[in-house]
């Protein structure tokens, strides 16, 4: 089990893991802490999923030359740890939106005009490359409004979990 962080245009991942109190959890449990864009190998999507790429609804149009995904994820079990919040493009976030951040690089914003089709393509990719996928959603606080950055927080004190990435 290891913790993985992507690169984002919103906040530095190193700052985020400190401010969100993720580092103490990683350290307490002796997990390897991996920043996917620092020394990790990435592979071309066609090398990872083969002919499945021909079935993508939109990613081939958005990325005509293809795109790279983290090699580390191939054959791995994945546990997504999303939070409950709204999103201006997808209505809500969750495990599927987590895959968006984990499988696509920082140019992923080019998929926003076709975000729902992108999430379907990412589900296909996850089913192909991961041995298992599970999500535990933190609903201690839930975000409402024009998220993910400008939300009104609400205390909800719930935790949701499922192997169904669409449901969670």
Per-region residue spans from a language model:
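Extended, low-polarity segments enriched in aliphatic/aromatic residues
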Residues: 1-168
């Amino acid at each position: 089990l290891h913790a993985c962080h992507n690169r984002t245009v919103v906040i530095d991942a190193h700052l985020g893991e400190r401010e969100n109190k993720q580092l103490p959890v990683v350290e307490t449990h002796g997990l390897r802490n991996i920043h996917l864009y620092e020394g990790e190998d990435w592979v071309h999507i066609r090398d990872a999923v083969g002919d499945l790429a021909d079935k993508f609804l939109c990613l081939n149009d958005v990325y005509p030359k293809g795109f790279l995904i983290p090699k580390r994820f191939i054959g791995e079990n994945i546990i997504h740890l999303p939070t409950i919040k709204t999103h201006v493009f997808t209505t809500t976030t969750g495990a599927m939106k987590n895959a968006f951040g984990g499988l696509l690089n920082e140019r992923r914003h080019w998929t926003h005009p076709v975000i729902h089709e992108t999430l379907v393509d990412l589900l296909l990719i996850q089913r192909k490359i991961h041995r298992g996928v599970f999500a535990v959603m933190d609903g201690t606080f839930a975000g409402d409004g024009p998220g993910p950055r400008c939300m009104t927080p609400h205390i909800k004190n719930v935790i949701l979990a499922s192997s169904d990435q669409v449901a969670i």
